[in-house]
Amino acid sequence: MKKSNDSKQQGMSLIEILVVIMLISICSLWGMHGWQGYQQALRLEQNAQRLRLYLISLQTQANAYNRSIILWAIGGIQGCVGYSLRPASCTSSEGLPRFVMSESDMEVLDFTEKVMGFYGIRNAAQAGHITLMNSAGSIRLVLSARGRIRLCSEGKPMPGSPQCL
């Protein structure tokens, strides 16, 4: 048997391996960035839904006991929303229940300066809005005069809420 020394090259070269590693790392970084953006959007939507549920409970309370509940909001990072007497800051330890942002990067960006609240008769409300924001975008909570509470996203679309008109 005659052995020939002209065997074909098998395997991958160092440059090919480096190109594959570079492509994998680029795809991983891109996926991680997308995942972080998705997590931020999810946190924003969850906080907006929590605020919506808090306001629905206040609306139910106003309707059940036929009384008025006037809302207030304190803007800024880790802002808060509540009713009755407005404290000086969100960190004051008064006994009144209020909604405080659970995430450190959440912000109460904008809210209606006029009186906003619920009135027990016929489940009516004084219309207004509260806007929550983080790095993923912003969601506006809208309170209509008929007592409907809805969410919409400002700017870019967010999962789980339609865009504001």
Language-model segments: residues:
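Alpha-helical hydrophobic helix detector
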Residues: 18-33
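N-terminal helix-rich module
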Residues: 2-6, 30-165
